[in-house]
């Protein structure tokens, strides 16, 4: 592979999509209250509880996805999904809205629903800061039937509070609608996101697309001249050929006998890190069950170690239905006919949404700051210490972490780099 090409792109399309049976232009009996974006000073008082709630939600989502299909590649952004669910809840009322938002902020149930939306602004602001640094791209897009009129307050609120892009589109011809949505996403966001929408219900009048893209530039590059084809051991019966990247340097390393796994942390520019966790041979299923609970301890015990790192690179484009998973983490009504929206004339409403997450990591992206301390990370010629060999040639986990907040921006499970 030539110098400068991406070594790893993992993408997952998690199907979630908004279907409304009947959208009315009539005045609603219950209008939503205006939400004032919360300031950092107001966030401070609730920050500790919000952080615990966010981590609990991300952990439940992680465990649910693992149990659902442990032998499948997976990638999702808990931050982005949290924002999308909060956005959808703005279109709900009564118990349905309370159920959706309470799952995100479990310990803040005594607060008004609108105060909870203000509390969630810390996630929105964090993504906006990353976008300013051109490290991350995040967008929620509502495609709405131009032949129907929606409650204008709803549109104003989702735009103002969660910065949602609203696109009016003709839903009469579903095939043309699918093509139009897919073309818009490909042209405006990501050309690799082809055929994002594969099915639209005949009654669909609204479709939500949630997109999040991370472009990680490693501070210390892989040695591109050492990349070559090698075996990746999916299991005892399945072996696939992948491009294996290599580098030897001082690295952030951790070993857990409790989790039976090894961790390597690779800093990226602009306060983000790629964290790779490699379960021991034959211990992948054990790590699946214990990862959510024991990973934090693994990261706390890290140290600088001279290591010889080998990591598989490839591209995966995955698709999975998501709405049957949400009830398992406590969101029971949002995708059923029990959902009540203040945008409809009937109580029968079905909701779905599309979450498209992409990670791109360049193997050669040495930044200026990293160049200054490259002598610190490189292995001295006269060093007698034997490097620890860490070879990601079997199923592993990948996390993208924000170094300032310690939140997971992305969570990924690479089971087979050659399958979708």
Curated annotation (Swiss-Prot):
It is found in: Secreted, Extracellular space. Keywords: Glycoprotein, Pregnancy, Protease inhibitor, Secreted, Serine protease inhibitor, Signal. SUPFAM superfamilies: Serpins (SSF56574). The keyword Membrane does not apply. GO terms for molecular function: serine-type endopeptidase inhibitor activity. Coiled coil: none annotated. Glycans are attached at residues 225, 271, 343. Residues 1-25 form the signal peptide. It holds the Pfam family Serpin. The record marks 381-382 as: Reactive bond. GO terms for biological process: female pregnancy. InterPro entries: Serpin_CS (IPR023795), Serpin_dom (IPR023796), Serpin_fam (IPR000215), Serpin_sf (IPR036186), Serpin_sf_1 (IPR042178), Serpin_sf_2 (IPR042185). The keyword Secreted applies. GO terms for cellular component: extracellular space. Belongs to the serpin family. UTMP subfamily. This is Uteroferrin-associated basic protein 2. The lineage of its organism: Eukaryota, Metazoa, Chordata, Craniata, Vertebrata.
């Amino acid at each position: 592979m030539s110098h400068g090409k991406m070594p790893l792109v993992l993408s997952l399309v998690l199907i979630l999509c908004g279907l409304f049976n009947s959208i009315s232009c009539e005045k609603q009996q219950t209008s939503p209250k205006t939400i004032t974006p919360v300031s950092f000073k107001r966030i401070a008082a609730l920050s500790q509880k919000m952080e615990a709630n966010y981590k609990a939600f991300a952990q439940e989502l992680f465990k649910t996805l693992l149990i659902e299909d442990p032998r499948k590649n997976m990638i999702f952004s808990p931050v982005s999904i949290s924002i999308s669910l909060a956005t959808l809840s703005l279109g709900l009322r009564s118990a349905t809205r309370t159920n959706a938002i309470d799952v995100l902020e479990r310990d803040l149930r005594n607060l008004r629903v609108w105060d909870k939306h203000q509390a969630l602004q810390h996630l929105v602001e964090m993504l906006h800061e990353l976008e300013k640094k051109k490290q991350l791209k995040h967008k929620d897009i509502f495609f709405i039937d131009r032949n129907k009129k929606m409650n204008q307050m709803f549109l104003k609120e989702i735009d103002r509070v969660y910065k949602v892009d609203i696109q009016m589109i003709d839903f009469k011809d579903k095939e043309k609608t699918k093509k139009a949505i897919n073309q818009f996403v490909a042209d405006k966001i990501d050309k690799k996101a082809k055929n994002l929408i594969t099915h639209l219900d005949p009654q669909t009048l609204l479709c939500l697309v949630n997109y999040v893209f991370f472009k990680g530039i490693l501070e210390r590059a892989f040695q591109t001249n050492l990349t070559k084809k090698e075996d990746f051991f999916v299991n005892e019966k399945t072996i696939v050929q992948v491009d294996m990247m290599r580098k030897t340097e001082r690295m952030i390393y951790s070993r857990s006998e409790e989790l039976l796994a090894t961790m390597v942390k690779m800093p990226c520019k602009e306060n983000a890190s790629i964290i790779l966790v490699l379960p021991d041979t034959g211990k992948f299923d054990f790590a699946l069950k214990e990862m959510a609970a024991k990973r934090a301890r693994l990261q706390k015990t890290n140290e600088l170690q001279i290591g010889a790192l080998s990591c598989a690179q490839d591209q995966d484009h995955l698709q999975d239905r998501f709405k049957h998973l949400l009830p398992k983490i406590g969101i029971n009504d949002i995708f059923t006919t029990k959902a009540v929206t203040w945008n409809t004339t009937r109580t029968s409403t079905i909701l779905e949404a599309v979450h498209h997450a992409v990670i791109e990591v360049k193997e050669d992206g040495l930044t200026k700051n990293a160049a200054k301390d490259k002598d610190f990370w490189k292995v001295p010629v006269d060093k007698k210490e034997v490097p620890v060999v860490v070879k990601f040639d079997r199923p592993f986990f990948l996390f993208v972490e924000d170094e300032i907040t310690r939140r997971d921006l992305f969570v990924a499970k690479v089971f087979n780099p050659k399958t979708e």
